[in-house]
Amino acid sequence: QHARDILLSGADKVAINTGAVKNPKIITELMELFGRQCIVVAVDVKRNYNVAGQKNVFTGNGKKFWFEVFIYGGKKETGIDAIEWTKKMESLGAGEILLTSIDMDGTKDGYDIDLTREIVNSVSIPVVASGGCGKPEDMIDVFKKTDVEAALAASIFHYETHSVNRVKELIKENGIPVRI
């Protein structure tokens, strides 16, 4: 109901995370009412090194892991594989994925390129990368190494380390399309 009210109030899009996990059919219901382009599924993901079970397993730094979906602002694990989840959300009507790496969020060490690449390659809807941007080069890196549609950054702007305009100029200088 809350998402419906937000869209009826004039918002272009609404992002849903915990609500989608608890009631996945809400994605289809909202999509049918407002259109796919309005429905963003926010997916908070953390690497899980307990690889028991049927998960998409990856190896990094000599360790095996899978990408697990978290809810309640990244505080509660779900046991849901992020790759399978994003595919399901697309099939239910999501128009976009807002992908946040819990592991990288707040570190200012760059985006989780492996996670972003895997999610982008598993869906055909736009993916927005989030979590970890500490400098303009991190944004350039995620655009060049993945087919991500957009990149979200907070810390570099909150602490006025870089201006939005300067970051956009640097992105454009690196051959990445951006609105100036």
Say what each PLM segment does:
Residues 103-105, 133-136, 157-158:
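Short Gly/Pro-enriched loop/turn and capping motifs at secondary-structure junctions
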Residues 26-34, 140-180:
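C-terminal helical cap(s) of enzyme catalytic domains, especially alpha/beta-barrels
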Residues 26-45, 108-135, 174-176:
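Alpha-helix-loop-beta-strand connector modules within alpha/beta enzyme cores
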Residues 5-8, 28-30, 54-58, 111-114, ...:
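Short, glycine/charged-enriched secondary-structure capping and boundary segments
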Residues 7-99, 103-104, 175:
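Conserved anion-binding
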Residues 3, 24-28, 83-87, 113-117, ...:
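Generic structural signal for well-ordered alpha-helices
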Residues 1-10, 49, 114-151:
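Catalytic cores of alpha/beta
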Residues 16-17, 72, 129-130, 153-154:
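Thr-Gly-centered strand-to-loop micro-motif
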